[in-house]
Amino acid sequence: MSAAKDTKQFQYEIQEYQEDCIDNIVSIFDNLHQKEDFVEVLTAHKNKHKYNFPIQNTKNKNIDIMMETGTGKTFTFIKTIFELNKHYGYKKFIILVPSVPIREGTKTNLKDTKDYFKSVYANEREKEIETFVYEGGN
């Protein structure tokens, strides 16, 4: 007798605003490959899309992406990881979370969406996300 595997089967419906977010992020990276000036790239992107957020003139190349609660942030950033890998070959990403429950939820989402993204990106080099969890002090 073989025991049945307890697998989760989800139907994922990608929302237009999630695709817009992913496309925006990918386009910022596309422009970064063409220009050296990070602030110039972000300012042009902001003006093109008529966004209302401040651009800090800094040497650090940081992008803070925010979405409302319940909008599918985790799914969106996982898909963004695959898209950045597909378009630019990026392989290493750091995901920072503020608490243990959110970390555990993120790990669960990465596991639950594994088969979905494996099928969507079947022809890509990297089809799975390998994770390593760093906890302060270890």
PLM ranges: what are they?
Residues 1-138:
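RecA-like P-loop NTPase motor core of helicase/translocase proteins
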